[in-house]
């Protein structure tokens, strides 16, 4: 065999190894997908807005609709979550474009301007854009009327703060499109304010008009009851997350699958119920009375709510107490319930309350009773929804609440979903249905309204305290409401006089405003506990 014969296989071997090496280099040089980058980093970076709906730091840590969704998405990826809140909308999309965040989850709509440069995920709820004004002021019924009014007012007062929107918002994009038809219309783009800042200015008469999403308006009315929607400027628009546009489909595909699974499992519906399910008809008169009570009554009872709230958020306990008694320790009803937490005599005895008119005993007893209801709520119900079932039990009784769950199941709906069960609660007072139940007739519509009112009061308390925090610059929300209790306040006669004066003032204010209010007044239920 010639030497050349040996060289052929050796040369072939070297050529094969070289080819493998080149292929390996080519594989290594291929760019990583977005998913691979995130998993390799071990962190999902989420841009969001700091507000009660999307993301904020509560007493128990981070919370918010977009936060909870992002937390579940990070679990799906098997990485940690890093929320990167922005205080100005205009800084969010540049951060996404520059690669500082992986996604934006901030309750933003799919405007045409955004979809030019970014990709939107699946819609998870819908909103309309509304023109907002101060109740009692002139109300435009259309954009044409608004433009005509502006021309009249600015002719006499060119410096008038007429219409402002947030910089780089979908409201700005909508108004720019409107200017194509109404070129004389003028509006101010505010780069130093967020939507809540502008809504506050409208409520205080510092600005005539602004724009906000329908959900934002409903939530803000619980803090600023003077706000009202003049008219809708758009149809319902989808709210979604956003990612960068690229040829890489990996992150987008997983996002589609993620939201699809959430919808199918019912988890998305339960989160929406938690954060926006309580939004209902706005009651101007009741809300004004509540806002006033936040300043005149809540501070006196805050230390006791904080002391006895135990595993509950003290602000939720405060909302429950307002629904029961309007924070009046001497409240009583014809059915025999009385005190700050409106306990029946049997319930009071069962939780060790000897004097239902003693505020401290009443709060302690009410929280203990709520805790017992929580313990009885079935474990099949998700943790974040258990409280609504417990509150319904607090009002209507555990047996009736379970009857409503059984009715829900018999009708093919989910007995562990508060959204499904609350729709069946009114059936407890319809003969067609309550004759099928174990405990019979109950005022189920009141129980449903009872829980929804507490949820609204709870969100209002949170928003009110946050506004006071911003106004004072104090980083401790709790310290804002903890006011030293005057010893005289625990003198029963002196306390009664104070409360009687407040009650008269609230009643007078309600009567004055009820004539101009077209919305029905939702009164708190005094349904006895059982």
Swiss-Prot record:
GO terms for molecular function: peptidoglycan lytic transglycosylase activity. It comes from the Bacteria. Its EC number is 4.2.2.n1. Residues 513-530 have a biased composition (Low complexity). Keywords: Cell outer membrane, Cell wall biogenesis/degradation, Lyase, Membrane, Signal. The active site is at residue 324. It is a peripheral membrane protein. Its main location: membrane. Residues 28-279 are annotated as: Non-LT domain. Residues 1-27 form the signal peptide. It holds the Pfam family SBP_bac_3. GO terms for biological process: cell wall macromolecule catabolic process; cell wall organization; peptidoglycan catabolic process. InterPro entries: Lysozyme-like_dom_sf (IPR023346), MltF (IPR023703), Solute-binding_3/MltF_N (IPR001638), Transglyc_AS (IPR000189), Transglycosylase_SLT_dom_1 (IPR008258). It is found in: Cell outer membrane. Residues 280-530 are annotated as: LT domain. One of its GO terms (cellular component) is cell outer membrane. Residues 505-530 are annotated as: Disordered. It catalyses: Exolytic cleavage of the (1->4)-beta-glycosidic linkage between N-acetylmuramic acid (MurNAc) and N-acetylglucosamine (GlcNAc) residues in peptidoglycan, from either the reducing or the non-reducing ends of the peptidoglycan chains, with concomitant formation of a 1,6-anhydrobond in the MurNAc residue. HAMAP family: MltF (MF_02016). In the N-terminal section; belongs to the bacterial solute-binding protein 3 family. PANTHER family: MEMBRANE-BOUND LYTIC MUREIN TRANSGLYCOSYLASE F (PTHR35936:SF32). The N-terminal domain does not have lytic activity and probably modulates enzymatic activity. The C-terminal domain is the catalytic active domain. Murein-degrading enzyme that degrades murein glycan strands and insoluble, high-molecular weight murein sacculi, with the concomitant formation of a 1,6-anhydromuramoyl product. Lytic transglycosylases (LTs) play an integral role in the metabolism of the peptidoglycan (PG) sacculus. Their lytic action creates space within the PG sacculus to allow for its expansion as well as for the insertion of various structures such as secretion systems and flagella. This is Membrane-bound lytic murein transglycosylase F. It comes from Vibrio cholerae serotype O1 (strain ATCC 39315 / El Tor Inaba N16961).
